[in-house]
Amino acid sequence: MDANQKLLDFAKLLNQKNDSRPVIEKLKDNISGDLLNYFLNLLEEISKLDTDQPLSVTSLRCLQLFVHLTFLLGVYTQLPKEMLSQAKIKALPIYTPKKNLVQIYNILLPLLLTPSLLQGPLNLHYADLLLLHLYLLNCHEQGSLIEEPRPLFLDPSWKEKVTSIMSPQMVDPSKMISSCLSLLQPNVDNWLQDKLKHYLTTCLCRETGVQGFLKVYMQAQPNSIERARQAAHLISSVPKDISPQKYFSCILPQVWSLFSTQPRLASQLIIAVTNTHCDIVTSFLLKKLQILEAPKVIDLSPFENALDVLQVLVYIQNDDIIRICESCVPSLLHLQENTTLRSKVQDILLRIISVCGTKSLLRNLTNAKHLRIFCERLTKSQLAMFLPNLLEIWVQQPPDKRLELLELVQYALSNVDSDEIPSNVMLSVCTNLINEVASQNKYSSTEISQITTNREVEEENEEILLVLLNIISSVIGRNAELDLENPISSLLPALEQLSNYSNREISDLAKDVYKTLIQSKDDYSLALSYTQSDLVPVRGQGVYMLRKLIEKKDDRINPVRVLHVLINLLRDENSYVHLNVISAVVSLCDKYDDSLIRLLKEYTNTNKFTVDETLLIGQAIYQTMERQGELVAKFYGQIEQTCLSMLNNENTDIKISSLNIARLLCQMTSSDAFIESAKNILILEMGSDKQFLRRAAVQLLDSCKHLPDSVITTLSYVGSHDKDDFIKESCLNILANQADAAKYYLQ
């Protein structure tokens, strides 16, 4: 009977439904002689079968079982128990093998080397064969292998073959790493622990070792951040038998390659290594990023590779990594000249200034043209934040560089709205610069109007003064709420002196700015009085002035009083005033936390306000939540209770308003109460006048990540039977999204 037929016969035997005995008991009754010897002989027979010969699934499973039983009876029973896992120890049968471990090793090892039908089943037990190999190797080193036969690894003719399947330098890294990790049991002897760790280190230092380790380690939880951190910690731990420099010289190039395929894992690795060996990481990254300093781009590939890595690095929240990114700014500014790379370069620069501010762009400025290219990419808001530092650098430049930067300063000024400029920062910068220019040698210590003999320097300084004074004039023109606190108090003396300056344009401008600042002293009272004016534009200006005072958290602001004033202004009949009031209320809630709580209480006070006024308060709450984003979660309980209360209101528009607020909250955090309320609306509110209420309920459900089965059932019904096409289509989209989310979760 050939080996294939034996497999089929044993498969039938083992699948007998009326025989519930253990597998080994069944086999003992049908095999004459020693079980282990029979299995080993059968495996040798199978190894001689034609590899193209098809095996049924049943035969293959039977073969896998025989290989497993061979290890169970021949290997597990003879190895020390501390080397085995608890599962293997529990599975041990009462059996004494007639072949020792060396004999079994010498049979199984050639089978693994020979291309045959056994390759797959044996590789499933590769870790066990590796364990047997290491055990026998240790026995040999301890001098306890003195009897025949000798293990094959001692046979010179087999040495190279054994190395090819047992050496960590030859075997596929992921296969070896997986085996070593599975063998690292808590109670294994120190010699085995050291040997396995050495094998792991050897694998990690190979060209694809890190990738192999991550493939194995992350397999259980591929999307887990915590698992990724654990993997990074293990890889960044330097083994005892190798220096950090040598170890990371093998690891870091692999991490660099990972940035293109697994950026999230590469980031965790870089963070872990930086925390323990910052100098090594810094040196490595700077050397790799040095390509960006090349004067010309000949081959795009290395530049794109470096930029791809840098694009990931700029999002790592680590000060040392950020400093490395910052050091690349001059090179990045220069690389903007390459049209292919420009977009990616500018994205990186934008991220750097969002983290480090704009000074990093100016600290090593060598070419104003490069900076101008970047500034053209900035939004007005970004340009406004950039302007103060640009002015500082401009004034501090040597005379031959100022003219080059002046064009950029003028470009920035002409493209920034005056109310976009950060007022206090800008005024502080301009004040310091005016005092600096005014104190230069062209003036005496007492007379700022004294003319220097060096006319060229004076003209240049006059140009600077004009720019700075115009900026200040523009800022205070849109910020009537500025008081005489710093930096204004330190600006007034310089303005007084400049009022007597010989250049008429400068003196007139200085007088005008000085007068405006003095008159702005009592702007808070002025703003409140404006809100009571009969003229719509004046009321609007009063609200605008209050909003600006709120946004800078002026000490004179009483949040309770101001909220009361603003809510009363919602009764104003003019929509222009409404819009300004809502913006001011949003700013108040953003700056003073308790204001949102008070606003929620006012929202529920429907006896005090008309429906339209209640809806405007709801709009203010909605916009406040939009501005605060995830920070609004701290008011989750109050917002949820308020919305649930308002859903009981008889007015449909008020219900829709509360559903819109609830929808925004559900985008940030889940609420079973909101989901249930929306479901009930779809079931109960069926009239034609409830169409928009039902739409709002569907939109709320669309904002929820996970919906219970009862809601899915409701959506399925509504999606098929509702008369409103918008509602039907929305329901079907929600169902599709929920199905996709469930599919992703299962994967």
Curated annotation (Swiss-Prot):
One of its GO terms (biological process) is protein secretion. Required for the cytoplasmic assembly and the nuclear import of RNA polymerase II. It is found in: Cytoplasm; Nucleus. Belongs to the Tango6 family. PANTHER family: TRANSPORT AND GOLGI ORGANIZATION PROTEIN 6 FAMILY MEMBER, TRANSPORT AND GOLGI ORGANIZATION PROTEIN 6 HOMOLOG. Interacts with RNA polymerase II subunits. Interacts with nuclear pore complex subunits. Its main location: cytoplasm. Pfam families: RTP1_C1. The gene is rtp1. GO terms for cellular component: cytosol; nucleus. HEAT repeats lie at residues 37-75, 103-141, 320-358, 381-418, 459-485, 486-523, 557-594. InterPro entries: ARM-like (IPR011989), ARM-type_fold (IPR016024), Rtp1_C1 (IPR019451), TANGO6/Rtp1 (IPR039600). This is RNA polymerase II assembly factor rtp1. It comes from the Eukaryota. The keyword S-adenosyl-L-methionine does not apply. Keywords: Cytoplasm, Nucleus, Repeat.
